[in-house]
Amino acid sequence: MNLSAKTVVLIAIGAALYGIGGLPMFGIPVFANTTLKPAMAVLALFSVLFGPLVGFLVGFIGHWVTDMFAGWGVWLTWVLGSGLVGLIIGFYPKITRGRLEMGKFTKCDFALFVFLAFLGNVIGYGCSAYLDSVLYAEPFTKVVAQLIIIAAGNTLLIAIVGHYILTAVAKRKQQSYNLKEAD
């Protein structure tokens, strides 16, 4: 795997923003050891704009940073879950064939974005919940409750914040796209 300098910088910036933004002081505690993090919007944005590899690494490294600075130790199961969320949301530009880059963000594109956010949260944090239950003997009902709360909360947060950000990105790209066509 050969990453360009630009990609490495994007991953570092995204992971730092997601990692620091994921700290408990910026989140909303919702359940046992479970916090709704507004930083999920950062993960979704980097995933949509730069693809699955950047999304995975921003989620993985960023969650690792959160866990290290929060002081509760690194929970690799949840670090992996955040990486998977970023990976799945990162397929958005491939599925839409880069419509956002052309300044297009339709209702169908938004629905796909929300679906990928939900799917990413269910698969990513579903893996985390399963692995917590198997590896750490966490009560199954607890990890399933965490999964349901986080998947629903994160999807809602990503949908609301993401709608405004991606609409603005599309508008900006459309202006740039129109300038290129005028040349």
UniProtKB/Swiss-Prot annotation:
Keyword Amino-acid biosynthesis recorded:
no
Membrane topology term reads: Multi-pass membrane protein
Q: In which domain of life is the source organism classified?
A: Bacteria
* Cellular component annotations (GO), alphabetically ordered: plasma membrane
Location(s) in or outside the cell: Cell membrane
Principal localization reads membrane
Query: What residue range is the signal peptide?
Result: none
List membrane-spanning regions: 8-28, 41-61, 69-89, 110-130, 147-167
Q: Name one Pfam family in it.
A: ECF-ribofla_trS
Which UniProt key words apply to this protein? Cell membrane, Membrane, Transmembrane, Transmembrane helix
Family from the record: Belongs to the UPF0397 family.
Q: Which PANTHER family match?
A: UPF0397 PROTEIN BC_2624-RELATED, UPF0397 PROTEIN SPR0429
Query: What is the protein's given name?
Result: UPF0397 protein PBPRA2239
